[in-house]
Amino acid sequence: MILSALGSCQKDVILEDNTESGITHDSLIQLLDAEWKFKAPEYSDDVFYALNNWEEWRMMINNLEKKPAKSISAYQKKVSDLLNQIESLPETLPEGFQNQAILSRINLLKTHAPTLDMLLELNPIPYKETLPYFNLIQKDIRSIANQFQEVITKKNIPIESGEEQVRISVDTVRRAQINAIPTE
């Protein structure tokens, strides 16, 4: 009797039919498998070379492209691994890509991935709420890739003569002096 009590304390994924929503676990796994269609974003050659040494991004994309084994626990583990990889992205951004537009898109990805993780941990899994998050994560990744392209495009625009002087004269924050405001 004690052995059975100890054995039942383990946290196992219980595969029961989702009778509330009328869907079996086999059907749920088929739905998850059909929605897991992550693809690496298309890059220009300039972006590809700029991101070539960013190991965390490449590992995350490679991990997403591989479908998990056909079990709920495999999907849960895959999304949990994805969360860990996403957390390291802002700290490891390559030089030149550390701007607010890219960071905000990474933060959006950091919002959608934990929500997907939470939904996959529920029992029964609310598949109608879960499935849209696969598309949202793919859109977030595409949006980040588009921002990479925009950064490279802006960097390649040549500066015209006198443009730097205009920027400096217009930028009042740079011209402001600490002692300019009188103190009384």
Predicted ranges, named:
Residues 63, 85-88, 92, 119, ...:
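Amphipathic, soluble alpha-helical interaction motifs
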Residues 11-77:
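Immediate post-signal-peptide N-terminus of mature secreted/exported proteins
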Residues 52, 56-59, 81-84, 88, ...:
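Charged, amphipathic alpha-helical oligomerization/scaffolding segments
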Residues 88-103, 120-127:
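Short, solvent-exposed, charged loop/turn and helix-capping segments
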Residues 76-80, 100-107, 128-136:
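Short, charged, amphipathic alpha-helical segments
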Residues 27-43, 47, 124-184:
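C-terminal amphipathic alpha-helix
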Residues 4-8:
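C-terminal motif of bacterial Sec signal peptides marking the signal peptidase cleavage site
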